[in-house]
Amino acid sequence: MVKCLLLSFLIIAIFIGVPTAKGDVNFDLSTATAKTYTKFIEDFRATLPFSHKVYDIPLLYSTISDSRRFILLNLTSYAYETISVAIDVTNVYVVAYRTRDVSYFFKESPPEAYNILFKGTRKITLPYTGNYENLQTAAHKIRENIDLGLPALSSAITTLFYYNAQSAPSALLVLIQTTAEAARFKYIERHVAKYVATNFKPNLAIISLENQWSALSKQIFLAQNQGGKFRNPVDLIKPTGERFQVTNVDSDVVKGNIKLLLNSRASTADENFITTMTLLGESVVN
């Protein structure tokens, strides 16, 4: 009996703290409301494993085992077409999507994605990467000129379901902003949730937040050793087009708005940042 108890405690000890993706997240636009969209984004965030919280914001893992690296968003359009979108939990990037027996991968998708995701499908590599510059070039449009909103998301799902090569880049821009970016920023989530029946063009505040997530994440982390002050200010733009700087964690841009922090340990050249991460015990997960 004692041996069994000890074994049980050992198993529990091994698994406590090991990050896991909690499963797929579903969203059906045919019955969507502002409330169900908000719940979808909240559920999406909740599936993402994190190291610890920094100023009450989850800090994503920089490295995680292949088996836990991706989660799926199952999205259904107004016309009941469903695609499964694969998200990398280390950075909330869209890496691939599946429609029926075919799957499509961004050009820079990690090798693990090809090995793990959508087995049994015919895998196609898209002729562009998933970054905004590449997608806007492929779409022949900038984000400011592409509609967002739940109707736009439904149309994007339909485009991707049937894979219209000409329209796919724009559809992917809609998909990324209404899912991944909304998970990162409460401001974007709330903006999309207002547009259940109509669409909108993203304002400059949305675009600048999307562009500066990495910079904001890094400065929020570094602020722990600087009394909440940023080492370097982060430039953003207001909806009116006015430019301003975020200089500390007490800013409204940070508090209640940023919901996930990118862990830049793997890519930053700042040795102090890397050292601090190590001292805090953020470890590589195998």
Swiss-Prot record:
Gene3D superfamilies: Ricin (A subunit), domain 1 (3.40.420.10), Ricin (A Subunit), domain 2 (4.10.470.10). Glycans are attached at residue 74. Bound to a branched hexasaccharide. It catalyses: Endohydrolysis of the N-glycosidic bond at one specific adenosine on the 28S rRNA. It comes from the Eukaryota. The active site is at residues 93, 132, 181, 184. Pfam families: RIP (PF00161). Its EC number is 3.2.2.22. Possesses anti-HIV and antitumoral activities. Inhibits HIV-1 integrase. Manganese or zinc required for enhancing substrate binding rather than catalysis. This is Ribosome-inactivating protein beta-momorcharin.
